[in-house]
Design a protein with these regions (language model features):
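Conserved, structured core segments of small domains
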Residues: 1-144
Length: 144
């Protein structure tokens, strides 16, 4: 089962304040532990919402609306994420609890969410087969 550890933004991360070298070192050590355990799939930090773009669909069937950042409510923003694959929900919680304070200022907040697997969403064998083809193509593109 896959889980995403969503690192919530703070006013500092939204202002573009970069983490200290001490925090970078702590996060690198943590990521090394995830790699050694064979559970890390991806981990990235995100730029502030001021460089972001939001696409909204104000009404069903209407044209999409493009909105440039910055966006309000830093607590609702995401500053980064770590994607892991583990055997149990409890293991995901254990890894999330081991993550250093993601901002280093005592403001860190991590939201842990389980990722839907393709099988959870697509019960139709034809849809599953099409999805498998797409995933193989993505893997082949990564190798090229």
């Amino acid at each position: 089962m896959r889980f995403m550890m969503i690192v919530k933004a703070t006013t500092d991360s939204e202002a573009g304040t970069l983490p200290s070298q001490e925090l970078i070192d702590a996060m690198q050590k943590y990521n090394e532990e995830l790699v050694k355990a064979g559970v890390l799939l991806a981990a990235d930090g995100l730029q502030p919402s001021s460089s972001g773009i939001r696409i909204s669909y104000p009404e069903p069937g209407s044209k999409a609306k493009v909105i440039d950042g910055p966006f309000t409510e830093a607590k609702e923003m995401i500053a980064g994420y770590t994607l892991i694959e583990v055997k149990t929900r409890e293991e995901a919680i254990e890894w999330a609890l081991r993550m250093p304070d993601p901002h280093g200022f005592g403001q860190g907040e991590i939201e842990l969410r389980q990722v839907y697997e393709v099988e959870d969403l697509m019960g139709n064998p034809e849809s599953l087969a099409k999805e498998a083809v797409l995933r193989r193509q993505v893997e082949e593109q990564k190798k090229a």
